[in-house]
């Protein structure tokens, strides 16, 4: 069963009444009864608990008068901070064991009581910016709370100071520094309240409010850190190390560090927004949803909306306020520094976005890059095209540095470019790259109506573009030049990969002809005799029976760089003689190094048949 606050209050009142009645029944008089209550530990525990209940009731009454009903976030923050304050109070009791008394406990309870109102005032002022309606009663309550808290903090600071001066160092040092820190918090809340008030009185949004709030937070955190530092030094000289102040001191240092970094990063982000982020034109706004998600208002050209590197558009003043606290996109949470390094410059992005918004992509007739070679090296051309197209949907330019727009394939695309999906790679020998089937080779004897000899599509027409648009498409900035160099490097890698695969294919499939035997039939002999005399012969050398490999390939694209790499990566075959691949001067292929009478007879028949079918040319007719 959960114990409610009402049950605890009722039980405390009943226990207190029973304790007091018992003391008066035993002693019959007022003074002996008070002495009896003060000497009994059980009676003092009941009275202490009743005092805490009375403080709680007073807090609830003042809270309902000054703040009304608390929001869920305010109640949660108050509960968390109260538990931490109670634990710190218990640690403070261990430090001041000699000063422990009823007055000491009452002072700590009063300090916790005033701290709760400071926390509520801080949360309530922060809610001003998110509240749709600010009434006059709210202003009266806040001004009353801030004035009362400032007066109480000043009074207790001065009381602790004069008590330390007259009576020497005591536990009043703790209360003096605690109320001084609370006075700094009251100053911070007052500054935020005045800034919010000034912002509410302006018909338009106040752009510099976030800057003042950030600098005010930096100043207050610096004051808090200085106060905690002085308090730790004084406590080390008077008593011992204040263990109960470690957590708030660490929080103050961390808040100061965060505020300092926010000031630096916000200034960098605002400078980047003013100098590098492009301004969105009216055509782009009309082609997209022109609602700023920060202020939920329509964006116009007069408000100078800015486009982030992730292609999201917001008001300039909204981004300025947003960058005071964090340097990410409000929509996708992308870091603006990472996006800015991979995005295009302002001029290129603006020109490409205008072309895309007008519905006229500059490269409408350009097919995808190497459509007949992409699947040979495992490049997902379709997926890449879909990704680029998705990134540019709705008139947003993609992240490519000089804004290349990829158009879908034309409807009159030749059939030789409409290839089937790439098949699965074939398993090759161990240690080699997986082999892919070669592309279909057009037949030289194809019919005129077939599409194997179709011409590729012509060059696109750029006559309808102006000089400025062509310059924007060209991309003369540093990012565009680096992108073009990278594209040429990729082309070289693709061509060299094709050369390596062709060498590997030639190495694992050597050209060998079958050795004819004496039992060959007459049909096989006639078929073999029809081979022309210009076929090159493969003359094997007296090398060991190891597989014959071709020499290291030489790249036509990189000079000596690729050749050196291939020479180091190709196994050396200098241990044995290399095979000769040059055409032989003989008119017939050499079949075997061992000759038999049957083989000589077959050879003579072939020579006679070839001479009869292909007579030598007559020099007189030339």
From Swiss-Prot:
Keyword match Nucleotide-binding: no
Keyword Zinc applies: yes
Keyword list, A-Z: Endoplasmic reticulum, Membrane, Metal-binding, Signal, Transferase, Transmembrane, Transmembrane helix, Ubl conjugation pathway, Zinc, Zinc-finger
Reactions catalysed according to its record: S-ubiquitinyl-[E2 ubiquitin-conjugating enzyme]-L-cysteine + [acceptor protein]-L-lysine = [E2 ubiquitin-conjugating enzyme]-L-cysteine + N(6)-ubiquitinyl-[acceptor protein]-L-lysine
Zinc finger feature spans (RING-type): 292-333
PROSITE patterns per record: ZF_RING_2
Topological domain spans for side Lumenal: 24-41, 121-141, 192-215
Low complexity bias locations: 526-538, 579-596
Regions of this protein lying in the Cytoplasmic compartment: 63-99, 163-170, 237-622
Record-linked CDD domains: RING-H2_synoviolin (cd16479)
Annotated localization: Endoplasmic reticulum membrane
Signal peptide segment: 1-23
EC annotation from Swiss-Prot or TrEMBL: 2.3.2.27
Reported function: Acts as an E3 ubiquitin-protein ligase which accepts ubiquitin specifically from endoplasmic reticulum-associated ubc-7 E2 ligase and transfers it to substrates, promoting their degradation. Component of the endoplasmic reticulum quality control (ERQC) system, which is also called the ER-associated degradation (ERAD) system, involved in ubiquitin-dependent degradation of misfolded endoplasmic reticulum proteins. Also promotes the degradation of normal but naturally short-lived proteins. Protects cells from ER stress-induced apoptosis.
Record text on subunit structure and interactions: Homodimer.
Protein known as: E3 ubiquitin-protein ligase hrd-1
Species: Caenorhabditis briggsae
